[in-house]
Amino acid sequence: MARGVNKVILIGTCGQDPEVRYLPNGNAVTNLSLATSEQWTDKQTGQKVEKTERHRVSLFGKVAEIAGEYLRKGSQVYIEGKLQTREWEKDGIKRYTTEIVVDMQGTMQLLGGRPQNQDGTNQAQQQRRPQQPAPQPQPAYDPMDDDIPFMDPYRFSCLLQ
């Protein structure tokens, strides 16, 4: 018997530029706010109604670096992660937050193109990350250990058969 499934899939719009920081071990963490909207027609008034939800998303590792480099306010993105609730104490009061966590088991895919400035240049090229750790020597490249955080097109092929 399965223990359970904790999977969240969102397609939404970044509400702000992602915030990238680095942990003491050098791993990247990116936080962003993702807005999703749904529309329906109110049966009593006949008017269209729209409701927007804002989701807190935390990305870890290589996918966090990619999100920080390519996502900007207004970017549309596909996120696949898990729901987690964190607890901490501030001023003697317990606080909680629930967020979508995207780690090595999760997925992030940019939808559409890279955001452009008015002069046509890529924003990611102009904005540099201020808190990058000192460069570490890279291990030899292993083509079988390719950590691309985008969806595998063959991943859902079993559903189509």
Curated annotation (Swiss-Prot):
Homotetramer. The keyword Membrane does not apply. GO terms for cellular component: nucleoid. This is Single-stranded DNA-binding protein. It holds the Pfam family SSB. One of its GO terms (molecular function) is single-stranded DNA binding. Signal peptide: none annotated. Residues 5-109 form the SSB domain. The lineage of its organism: Bacteria, Pseudomonadati, Pseudomonadota, Gammaproteobacteria, Pseudomonadales. Keywords: DNA-binding, Plasmid. It comes from Pseudomonas putida (Arthrobacter siderocapsulatus). It comes from the Bacteria. InterPro entries: NA-bd_OB-fold, Primosome_PriB/ssb, ssDNA-bd. Residues 110-150 are annotated as: Disordered. GO terms for biological process: DNA replication. PROSITE patterns: SSB. Residues 116-131 have a biased composition (Low complexity).
